């Protein structure tokens, strides 16, 4: 492979190094990964720290309530599917009269699996203390950080969808992510102490609070109060699954991916 010539137009540059490398869509998230390397951690420590940091610095694309998939090579390829299941009380009749699953509200919500991925990956390969992986993200959330232009654009789009929503399930989104009644502008400093407190509790309990403790109780209570179907039982029964990766050959290259239910990109 020629690393200095591209068959297409690109403004990106090849970055080389001798020991470690981290690449993300956000420099502060990349820095979170590098901090783990500098502390003596390995690639899995760095990847988890990056994923946690992205819930803060790119909340429009990543979240504590999201799912996660992972491919890890340690001499052989491992696949992890940490996507969540639908709530047990979500029956097919609730979609009567609909032609597709709605984009907003409680109906499309599944059990959030990302936290279980962080814990599961760390248990198998992590080298640093679990709580240490959260330190950069907590720092960004508490002290604030400059919002990137791309994130500001996505945030503005989300504002257009939810700023005037009157349904009770959107109240905390508006208070947290539209604190001035609008989305933050590019370069504006934004942070969330509540986000930091949540991450700190996840870190201190090894993720247990999120699925079987205080955070799980709060999520289930909020769902019950606002018309959601997610329960403490749904959260407690969640687990990440080790899966066999699938592959295909394309132009002499073998491409590996997580099998369905992921979309494979």
Can you name each region flagged by the protein language model?
Residues 265:
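Flexible, polar/acidic helix-loop-strand segments at domain edges
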Residues 1-31, 35-38, 43-205, 210-212, ...:
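Noncatalytic scaffold domains of N-terminal-nucleophile
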């Amino acid at each position: 492979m020629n690393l200095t010539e591209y068959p297409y137009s690109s403004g990106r540059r090849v970055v080389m190094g001798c020991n470690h490398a981290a690449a993300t869509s956000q420099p502060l998230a990349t820095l979170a990964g590098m901090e783990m390397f500098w502390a003596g951690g390995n690639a899995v420590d760095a990847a988890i720290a990056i994923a946690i940091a992205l819930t803060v610095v790119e909340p429009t694309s990543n979240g504590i309530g999201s799912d996660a998939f992972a491919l890890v090579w340690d001499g052989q390829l491992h696949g992890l599917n940490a996507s969540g299941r639908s709530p047990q009380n979500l029956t097919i009749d609730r979609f009567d009269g609909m032609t597709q699953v709605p984009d907003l509200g409680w109906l499309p919500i599944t059990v959030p699996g990302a936290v279980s991925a962080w814990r599961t990956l760390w248990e198998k390969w992590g080298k640093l203390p679990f709580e240490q992986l959260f330190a950069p993200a907590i720092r960004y959330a508490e002290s604030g950080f400059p919002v990137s232009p791309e994130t500001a654009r996505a945030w503005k789009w989300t504002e257009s969808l939810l700023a005037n929503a009157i349904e009770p399930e959107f109240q905390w989104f508006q208070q947290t992510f539209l604190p001035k009644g609008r989305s933050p502008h590019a370069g504006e400093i934004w942070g969330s102490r509540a986000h930091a407190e949540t991450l700190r509790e996840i870190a201190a309990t090894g993720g247990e609070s999120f699925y079987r403790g205080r955070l799980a109780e709060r999520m289930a209570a909020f769902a019950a109060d606002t018309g959601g179907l997610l329960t403490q039982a749904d959260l407690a029964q969640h687990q990440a699954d080790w899966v066999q990766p699938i592959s295909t050959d394309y132009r002499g290259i073998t491409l590996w991916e997580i099998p369905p239910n992921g979309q494979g990109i």
